[in-house]
Each structure stands twice: as structure tokens, then as C-alpha cells.
Amino acid sequence: MNIFRLFGKQRTAPAARERLQLLLAHERSSVGSDLVFLLREEILAVIEKHVQLDRDKVQVKMDCNEHVSTLEIDVEIPLNATVRAA
């Protein structure tokens, strides 16, 4: 007779799954800040090829949840912006 059976069957899979989800969420959030910075710089470089803009008036935000990540970009382009040929 196994003594561990007296205490009931342990259900470690749900706990392990939850710990893994927390770990992945933490890794995604730490990588997310670097990713947002890189995306911001690349997006600004592309926009600046066509239009002159103030880099301080650009905001990039990344939101992550368990199913999807969204990237929100807010670029203020002045009405009198100089348009450049590509």
C-alpha cells in the first residue's frame, strides 16, 4: 500500500500551468518594453522619410493579455508639415 494515496491525489498540473502563464506574461512584459522601443524607432524612421514631424509628439503603447497583444501608435502630424518625396 502506498502511503501517499492516503492523502489523496495531488493535482499539480493546474498549478504548474498557472505558474507557466505567469512566467510567460512576465517575460513578454520585459521583452515588450524593448520591442516597443525598437518598433517606435523603425516606425518613426519610415514616417520621417515622407513627412517632417516632432518625435516628442509620437506615442507608442503596447498592451498584452493572454490571447492577443495590441500596438497603439499616436502620431501628431502638423497640418503644415513638409511632405518629402520618397
Swiss-Prot record:
<protein>
    <recommendedName>
        <fullName>Cell division topological specificity factor</fullName>
    </recommendedName>
</protein>
<comment type="similarity">
    <text>Belongs to the MinE family.</text>
</comment>
<dbReference type="GO" id="GO:0032955">
    <property type="term" value="P:regulation of division septum assembly"/>
</dbReference>
<keyword id="KW-0131">Cell cycle</keyword>
<keyword id="KW-0132">Cell division</keyword>
<dbReference type="Pfam" id="PF03776">
    <property type="entry name" value="MinE"/>
</dbReference>
<dbReference type="GO" id="GO:0051301">
    <property type="term" value="P:cell division"/>
</dbReference>
<comment type="function">
    <text>Prevents the cell division inhibition by proteins MinC and MinD at internal division sites while permitting inhibition at polar sites. This ensures cell division at the proper site by restricting the formation of a division septum at the midpoint of the long axis of the cell.</text>
</comment>
<dbReference type="InterPro" id="IPR036707">
    <property type="entry name" value="MinE_sf"/>
</dbReference>
<dbReference type="InterPro" id="IPR005527">
    <property type="entry name" value="MinE"/>
</dbReference>
